[in-house]
Amino acid sequence: MDVVVFSLFIMILTVIAALTGEWWVHLRALKRIPIRIHINGTRGKSSVTRLICAGLREAGFSVLGKTTGSDPRILDLEGKDRKIHRLQKPSIGEQVRFLRYFGQFRPQAVVLECMAVQPQYQWITEQHMVKSTHSVITNARLDHVEEMGHRLRDIAMSLSNTIPFKGNLFTAEQDKLEIFNEVAAKRRTEVHAVTDHGVSHDDMMGFNHIEHPENVALSIAVCESLGISREQALEGMRKAQPDPGALRIWDLEMDGRHFSLVNAFAANDPQSTKTIWNMIKEHPSLDHEHTCAFLNTRSDRVNRSSQLLELILKDIKPDSLFVRGDKMERFEKPFFSKVKGRVEQFSEN
């Protein structure tokens, strides 16, 4: 046999052996984690990850979590946040590394927020990396349209890539539920459609931030499927540390005047922003005598900025509008000129 051919043959065998070994190590890590909960969806992933972890922990489960939202964190066995310091750009490959790391502790459950946006990577993450026992798709909304498609149906189909085979799917999505039902049926997965109708005002009391009822409803449903009572799950969720990007209200005093600042920057699509606006309109501690809106724009998301400005003009109707970003001249005539109060613009530079 030619030396070059023989060397190539040995190299190929070595690569195959290495890949097989890596796959075996990963499968062994998964076997050490009997309950694997994978959280996907357009909005609420980080919050639901934290709520489920807290509900399980309250019931005595040993549980680890990982969020990838505003500020990626590990949620350790005691429920404390451990900041993730990345030395390179985030990639879905880190899910494998963290699953192996988590497997060393042999927890009863791991709750992972999905990192992938592009459809093919969502498939790889679920079907080859996580292999979840419980999948959660919070909702399907018009976001990341460049990667997932410009129609809600396209986005729902993309998100459905994280529906497992022979597992459980929990979702609060209503408009595109039929898509999830169809995909789940082909994969012999049971669908648990959840609404927030059963979440009362009393249930929402005790949280140290503004939480969405549908996030709580989803998290309760997952906990109940694992034998945890609704009351016990809620008790744990109220103790959960909110995500850095969670919806919160800060009371400020400036020059003898009182202001309330609502941090809603994590909601960067029109539907989610409108939902939050409707929530805070009903909040008893907020005075709507004078409303200011602050919009942070991105030069690579012109369509998104236009949609949010349209929503601000139509629904919020602020007395003042503050906009940060570059190349904002395109918004002046169609939007800024229609604001009833003053408009302040801030450059990124």
Model-inferred region functions:
Residues 61-64, 109, 191, 291, ...:
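Hydrophobic anchor at the start of a short beta-strand
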Residues 52, 56-57, 184, 335:
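Hydrophobic alpha-helical packing residues
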Residues 27-33, 54-135, 139, 143-156:
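ATP-dependent carboxylate-amine ligase catalytic core
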Residues 1-40, 47-51, 59:
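Short, basic phosphate-binding NTP loop
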Residues 134-167, 171-193, 273, 305:
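Conserved catalytic-core segment of NTP-binding enzymes
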Residues 224-262, 267:
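Gly/charged, well-structured mid-domain segments that form the phosphate/adenylate-handling core
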Residues 175-176, 265-345:
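Active-site beta-alpha connecting loops in nucleotide-dependent enzymes
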Residues 129-139, 179, 208-242:
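A conserved, hydrophobic alpha-helical segment in the catalytic core
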